[in-house]
Amino acid sequence: MANYLDFEKSIKQIDDDISSAKIRGDDSAVEILKKNLEKEINKVYKNLSEFQRLQLARHPDRPYSLDYVRALLKNYYEIHGDRVFRDDPSIVCFLGYIADKKIVVIAEQKGRGTKYKLKRNFGMPHPEGYRKALRVAKLAEKFSIPIIFFIDTPGAYPGIGAEERGQSEAIARNLFEFSDIKTPTIAIVIGEGGSGGALAIGVADKLAMLSNSIFSVISPEGCAAILWKDPDKSEAATKALKITAEELKELNLIDDVIKEPKMGAHRDKDAAAKAVGNYIIEKLNELEKIPLDEILRKRKEKILNTGVFEEL
């Protein structure tokens, strides 16, 4: 049973009509309704608002990092622990192969269903998760293995324990280390890219977003609560924040947009995985042809050209 979003009500109605026509055995009605459905889908998805893309990015059926790992990697092996405090299940790390290319995957995992959402802390990493990511990245650097980051988090965990164990230091350390790690890196936002929680594994040679994913300095709800003292203003905040892939590409804050299947990645997970896999292979092939010194120079140049600042 498909989970329909609020703006998909007209699509749901036609889908329901098709199901009823099939039960009646009315083949001619089914064919007509299928054509109407195609038109309605094109109409609804032609000009999605920022808030609608936010809803798609948070869709409960959207493929998570482990879905992409299982679909794309062969002979993969999970790597656990930060060797300092504990293993954080919100960050998952793998050594494996994609199209016969050896890679390391470092990813944020939200978890599906109550049990696994709690296990993965809803995709909000603790500092030990980011330290695990750095430990595994350093291992990849040692053996000259490219790193693929999958970003999907509402943000780093803001709990007391996380702060006591140095959440801000862990994020800052990753920003520092990943800006100069001596191996090719590719980061892909597959759902939510929430603030520092996303940036902590988001410094890379190539940064891409799925077309219905979002990347923001703060959640729209948090922004609305701060600016307007009203969480109900989240739709206006979504528009003001410029969080969509297209907007961030126009601002030169990301490198590429990976097109999702019609109606979102959750509607065709195999097609979504194929698109992500093709992107990874294409960019790995590009980076393999560039000397490491040049990769590092371009990465540093890219970081220094990000954003706007004034020197006082």
Curated annotation (Swiss-Prot):
In Pfam terms, one family for this protein is ACCA
Entry's Gene Ontology BP terms:
fatty acid biosynthetic process; malonyl-CoA biosynthetic process
Q: Which GO terms describe its molecular function?
A: acetyl-CoA carboxylase activity; ATP binding; carboxyl- or carbamoyltransferase activity
The reaction(s) catalysed by this protein are: N(6)-carboxybiotinyl-L-lysyl-[protein] + acetyl-CoA = N(6)-biotinyl-L-lysyl-[protein] + malonyl-CoA
Q: What does this protein do?
A: Component of the acetyl coenzyme A carboxylase (ACC) complex. First, biotin carboxylase catalyzes the carboxylation of biotin on its carrier protein (BCCP) and then the CO(2) group is transferred by the carboxyltransferase to acetyl-CoA to form malonyl-CoA.
On assembly, the entry states: Acetyl-CoA carboxylase is a heterohexamer composed of biotin carboxyl carrier protein (AccB), biotin carboxylase (AccC) and two subunits each of ACCase subunit alpha (AccA) and ACCase subunit beta (AccD).
- Which PANTHER family does the record cross-reference, listed alphabetically? ACETYL-COENZYME A CARBOXYLASE CARBOXYL TRANSFERASE SUBUNIT ALPHA, ACETYL-COENZYME A CARBOXYLASE CARBOXYL TRANSFERASE SUBUNIT ALPHA, CHLOROPLASTIC
This chain's protein is named: Acetyl-coenzyme A carboxylase carboxyl transferase subunit alpha
